[in-house]
A protein has these predicted regions:
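Conserved divalent-metal-coordinating catalytic cores
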Residues: 21, 34-385
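Conserved ATP-binding module of the ATP-grasp superfamily
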Residues: 2-30, 99-100
Length: 385
């Protein structure tokens, strides 16, 4: 069978007219007891940034490597202190660096396996050819500086602030989803506009009007490097009914953050799978989760009553809330027409700049704030349905 397989490979070269005396066929013994297999790029395959990109699957099968069906990815900075590398990947990184020295290249595409004895097996090494050439590459040292700056920024933002909980988690999709709306690498204008219109304060003003805790002043979005993230501590605090006592608010936020830490795959589903933001018909059974997480019957009852009160008030006040929001959007529209009319008579650079500022402020005050409230009500409707 081995002989037939080798002859089949040789025939394929002939069919493709790939007749080269340098062609070779390498035979590896079958690797047993594989627990992890995958592909590692020694730099990011698109931009060539200094990260080991490990795409992997866990289990005995290695077919995911060849089929391209691997769904797990981890990125490790090339200049990271080796002691900080997760034990799971430490030996693999050592092997990769050894290969880089042998072939004198740090742009490689490597197929690998790891056995249950933590032995690294290299199946294939080839050049990484997908890196896009740019007119100006960012030096690795500059990336190191950005990482150091981001670490300092995170440490500062993670410190206890005026909100409940002594730590936070940053997510790119947990609330107001910047990853989807402005992208993972937004330009300066996109980021600043989204921050001004929504993430600086409109996001919590709308919620506070509905009876949730007012987290003023708290900016929801932060940028690390060029990527926007949502501060989940601020988000989770803003979705607690204001009537709950302070001690219980803190306990609830800590529970939410702990659950997100243990279930990071839920970061785009926090409204439905982590938080209790309104009363719905499954709430009493869902609140049972709190019993095994240190909440007393009295505390659970207080949370349930507060959510019921909040939800009833929102439903009863909805006609007025809706009417008020519509009035604000109509005011925004009328102001826009007035500004456009004034510009027709005097379209100077100064007037254009003034008009832009007026329109942005109107969008924020008369558009984004009511939208924040209505979006929250829409989420409540989705949860109840």
């Amino acid at each position: 069978e081995i002989s037939n397989a080798i002859n089949s490979v040789i025939s394929s070269y002939k069919i493709k007219n790939n007749r080269n005396n340098q062609n070779q066929i390498l035979i590896q013994s079958q690797t047993l007891n594989i627990v992890i297999s995958g592909v590692v790029f020694t730099r990011t395959p698109d931009a060539g940034s200094p990260y080991f990109v490990i795409n992997f699957e866990e289990g005995k099968l290695t077919t995911g490597v060849t089929k391209g069906s691997i769904g797990n990815t981890i990125k490790i900075f090339r200049k990271i202190n080796h002691k900080l590398i997760p034990q799971k990947w430490a030996n693999l990184i050592v092997s990769i660096k050894e290969i880089e020295k042998i072939v004198n290249s740090d742009k490689l595409d490597i197929e690998f396996g790891i056995t249950k004895n933590n032995q690294v097996v290299i199946f294939q090494v080839r050049p990484l050819t997908s890196i896009k050439r740019k007119s100006k590459d960012i030096p690795d040292n500059d990336v190191s500086k950005i990482i150091l700056k981001s670490k300092k920024q995170f440490k500062k933002l993670n410190n206890p602030l005026q909100l409940y909980s002594n730590k936070t988690i940053f997510s790119d999709m947990a609330d107001w989803n910047p990853a989807e709306i402005i992208g993972n690498n937004p330009n300066i204008l996109d980021y600043s506009l989204y921050d001004f219109l929504i993430m600086k304060n409109s996001w919590y003003i709308g919620r506070a009007k509905l009876g949730y805790q007012n987290v003023k002043p708290y900016r929801l979005m932060r940028k690390f490097g060029s990527k926007p993230y949502v501060d989940t501590r601020g988000s989770f605090n803003s979705l607690i009914p204001d009537g709950i006592n302070q001690k219980l608010k803190k306990k609830l936020v800590n529970f939410y953050l702990k659950k997100l830490t243990n279930n990071p795959h839920l970061h785009d589903k926090v409204e439905f799978d982590i938080l209790f933001t309104c009363y719905d018909f499954t709430l009493p059974s869902r609140l049972n989760e709190l019993k095994i997480n240190g909440f007393s019957k009295f505390e659970i009852s207080e949370i349930e009553k507060a959510l019921l009160k909040l939800t009833i008030e929102i439903i009863e006040k909805f006609p007025k809330i809706s009417s008020d929001c519509l009035s604000l959007t109509n005011k925004m529209s009328n102001n826009r027409k007035k500004i456009e009319s004034e510009l027709e008579h005097s379209r100077t650079t100064k007037n254009l700049i003034i008009s832009i500022e007026q329109l942005l402020n109107d969008c924020k005050k008369f558009g984004a704030v009511p939208f924040s409230a209505m979006a929250r009500i829409a989420f409540i409707g989705s949860v109840m349905l």
